[in-house]
Amino acid sequence: MTNELENYRIKRIEALQPKQETKNELTPAQRQTAIAELKKPNLLQRTSQLLQQCGIVGESTNSLIAYLVYCTRKQNIPLHIMFLGASGSGKTYLQERISELIPEEDKIEITQITENALYYFKQEELKHKLILIEDLDGALAVFYPLRELQTKRRISKTVTLKDSKGNLKTITLTVEGPVSVSGCTTKEKIYEDNANRCILLYTDQTRDQDKRINEYQTRLSAGEVNREREQQYRELFKNIQRVLRPIAIINPYAKYIVLPEQVFKPRRTMTLLLGFIEAITFYHQYQREVKKDNAGQLYIETSIEDIEAAFTLLKDVLFSKSDELTKATREFLESLKQLSKQTGSDTFNAKMIREQLRMNPGNMKRYLSELARYGYIKATGNRYRKGSYEYSIVKMDEYEALKSQIEQHLQSILAGIRELVKSGSVVQ
């Protein structure tokens, strides 16, 4: 029965295929406007400002990182991204807003996908596409082929079919990448294997961000937001995407870039960092001289400014990659430190924490347990007496020290590269 089902699915595959997206051809004026935008000075700063004009509230760093990552779908080795945060923190909203800037023909949006679905796309249907997954829980069944598509940039599946004479034969279904994958989840630990292949972005869950969003919502309801102008900016971004062309990138400074020793899993983190530097170079392609190597291949070169921009944008990503705590637990610990400073008390109990931080008791218990297990807090009291535990922070400045070390390391790399260029050891 399985063979018959596979046979039926193969026969019906063409009929079930969605209609192919027609590529929008730009008018000469649209192309000229898009290229002119890419040639303007301070491109990243200007892009960040324009993103805020598209209805994206706050999240300036996260939105710029995500946009640059989405650009890499056109390259041979794209980057991938994962949005993390508590339920209702705006993960899916941010992904949707950024993906609206990508042409429809270049993206595939998925809410839920079945186990073998990826194998039944046409061979090049996913090539250089952006795959958007609303919630990673909905793609749990395809995690293995999805990881293979991310890493090896192609997947294949061999199935058994019957020919017209009833004889069994095998065929291999092959789907080619590369693809750029973007997804959202609240479960950082569960999807750790997938997270290792992605740049991790944690949504802004501060009260200031809540105020910014509420203010935008009230302005929207009052008719004070120019929706037509927002759409015009979105169309401009889509046209910018259409004029970006694949091109080889060479980073002459790559061998001088060394990750901080504090970073966990340095091999994949280094790949992500170098890839993001190339993403910035790729986005600046209309401002770079196109060169030709000995084999006749065209390429552009990474500048020191690209590396500096990547270090600045990915600073928090590198902090999280160097922290053994999850982002949620880290934020809880930093809130405890702030609470200790405000109250002037070195110790606090569960009731005080819950009342002051206004948080769910279950989450609080989990965070306290994790912090105690890793040695960040010390608990004293009677385990048989409810509410008797008193907690104290072991070291108040450990995170600031970690961030300072990483910051100094990145600055020393930039200073070293500039010195090499100045001395003529590296040709700029």
Can you name each region flagged by the protein language model?
Residues 29-34, 46-53, 80-82, 128-133, ...:
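Short hinge/gating elements
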Residues 16-60:
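Charged, amphipathic alpha-helical linker segments immediately N-terminal to NTP-binding catalytic cores
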Residues 171-179, 186-334, 338, 420:
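Phosphate-sensing "switch" segment of ASCE/P-loop ATPases
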